[in-house]
Design a protein with these regions (language model features):
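N-terminal glycine-rich phosphate/pyrophosphate-binding loop and immediately adjacent elements
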Residues: 1-98
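Short, conserved clusters of charged catalytic residues that mark active-site
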Residues: 24, 132, 188
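Helical element adjacent to the flavin cofactor pocket in flavoenzyme catalytic cores
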Residues: 128, 169-206
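A short glycine/serine-rich beta->alpha loop
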Residues: 8-13, 157-158, 177-180
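Rossmann-like flavin
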Residues: 54-164
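General beta-strand structural signal in soluble alpha/beta enzymes
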Residues: 42-44, 148-150, 206
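Active-site phosphate/pyrophosphate- and oxyanion-stabilizing loops and adjacent acidic/basic residues
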Residues: 27, 135, 191
Length: 206
């Protein structure tokens, strides 16, 4: 998945398979292997993607929450306020709690539930965690185009919109709007892993 080549013109590089490495820079392997020291660096586009509707109107996804709220406001002022409130309520939680949990041994369900039940926000998260992405979006937003826009990102990643237990995932994808792209092409990730291994005495044969 980390293959880069000049598929059309010399010097114009194409990522043949993977382009966006959503979880690589946030994961522990990137830090523990110090991949940045081995040439693996990520660029963060301010505009991630867009959804184009049959009437040629569109919604563009921005990395900055303020710009994303302004984009949503073109369709629904209420939905823009909801989005802004979600960022205020859960943005920090995602960074300080949810992301570390993704890369840690799972807690016992009873322990996780007891921790979340201690706050109103946590109890709401438990409810959303059990729901489907469609149910969550229907609860939060009024504008169908806004719902479709956020749902499209989930389906592209391979998550079913009507699958129970993935409502929290929808919230994560709404609030964690990033699309890190490997500088110099996705193959730099493979090359960086090779260099990291060689720095510890390994011999890589291809």
């Amino acid at each position: 998945g980390c293959h880069t080549e000049a598929a059309t013109l010399p010097g114009y590089l194409h990522n043949i398979c993977s382009v966006v490495h959503t979880h690589i820079p946030t994961g522990p392997v990137y830090r523990e292997l110090e991949l940045d020291r081995h040439g693996v660096r990520y660029l963060y586009p301010q505009v991630l993607r867009g959804t184009i509707f049959p009437d040629h109107r569109s919604i563009v996804m921005h990395r900055e929450s303020e710009r994303m709220a302004a984009e949503i406001a073109r369709w629904s002022a209420r939905d823009a306020r909801t989005f802004t409130q979600l960022v205020a309520d859960y943005g920090e939680f995602i960074e300080t709690t949810y992301l570390p949990l993704m890369y840690s041994p799972p807690l016992a369900p009873s322990l996780q539930t007891s921790q979340l039940e201690k706050s109103p926000e946590g109890r709401t998260l438990l409810q959303w965690q059990a729901s489907t992405p469609v149910q969550l979006l229907d609860e939060l937003f009024e504008c169908e185009e806004v719902k479709v826009h956020f749902l499209a990102r989930l389906t592209v990643l391979g998550f079913a919109p009507d699958s129970f237990g993935q409502g929290w995932l929808a919230l994560f994808r709404i609030l964690k709007a990033e699309a890190p792209i490997c500088e110099g092409g996705s193959q730099q990730l493979a090359e960086g892993l090779r260099r990291a291994a060689e720095a510890h005495g390994a011999v890589v044969r291809t």
